[in-house]
Amino acid sequence: MLKVGFYLRELNFRGIANSIYIYAKNNQTILKNKSIIFYNSTALDNRPEAITEFKKKFKTIKISNLNELERINKNLKLDYIYFQRDGSKDEIVNNSKNIIHAVFPQNIFQYHGSNYAFISKWLSKTCSNNKFAFAPLPVQLLKNNQNLRAKLKIPKNAKVFGYHGGETSFDLVFVRDVIKKVVKQNENVYFLFMNIGKFFNHKRVIFTKGTFNQTQKVKFINSCDAMLHARSLGESFGLSCAEFAIKNKPIFTYGFCRQRAHFEICKNNIIPYYSYEDLNLKILSFNKDRKYNSNNLKKELSEKNTIKIFKKIL
């Protein structure tokens, strides 16, 4: 049995924390290893609810820096310490093997640690011409068909466009402007956000708090007919996009973004838009009854498949 430490620079509702939680769980339940969580107690974006969920499942240790982790490891004797971070050369823990899982584009000179891998095939291809491995992130969605429409007073026949992600990640201004126009044009269209800073006050533009609760997350996604993605940078993986796609939802996303992993991962569900006018037209003409099938993606990003690939980067 291996002892694997998982380090989080911040412990919150975002994709890194979610994917590390699933990796750490499956490292124990499937690979039969030991998972120990370390998180930076000084991070301003830590969320108590997320910390509580980790503590329920794992030994969870707060630290203020990696030197402290190194001191603790003199007794723990971890076999590996896993970092999911931007991928540029950074601090490591010298008395353990370090696994670096890079989430952003990096050139090959940023390679460091014992093993180095990207989180998507797109990153590996773009940054290393496929020379470096990639290990896709796991997607965990509970088998639950319930939704939040009744609770949020959204009619069953309404068209609902939703998004969840980092608080500032819905940052394309022209998309926000389209939303403001659409709610005036069509009373049957709703917009639903989770963990996004409120940018408009309207009864059909609904903002809900972020959560680490997987049941609430899947109910949120079930409430939507489509995802409206508006992150100007794009995605180096796109965990929230994959979550919507696996629930057979189409994904409206900006066609000119730089990081395009979600175009490859969710290719059968992507509806690109290119301008204010284009998005406005596509939202108004959207057919919510069209069926999407993501069975192949479900298998590719399943917990069993992704933990097998994770094992290869140890």
Where are these predicted regions, by residue range?
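Short hydrophobic beta-strand element within catalytic cores of glycosyltransferases
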Residues: P250-G255
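Acidic donor-binding loop of glycosyltransferase active sites
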Residues: L78, K219-S236, K249
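Conserved catalytic-core segment of nucleotide-activated headgroup transferases in glycan assembly
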Residues: L137-N201, F207
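Donor nucleotide-sugar binding/catalytic pocket of nucleotide-sugar-dependent glycosyltransferases
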Residues: S114-N145
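N-terminal strand-loop element at the rim of the active site
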Residues: L8-R14, Y21-E68, G197
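Conserved active-site histidine-acidic residue motif and adjacent donor-binding/catalytic loop
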Residues: I63-L69, G197, V205-I221
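Short alpha-helical segment that forms part of, or immediately flanks, the ligand-binding pocket
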Residues: V218, C241-I246, R260-A261
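A charged, aromatic-enriched C-terminal amphipathic alpha-helix characteristic of glycosyltransferases
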Residues: G15, E277, N287-L314
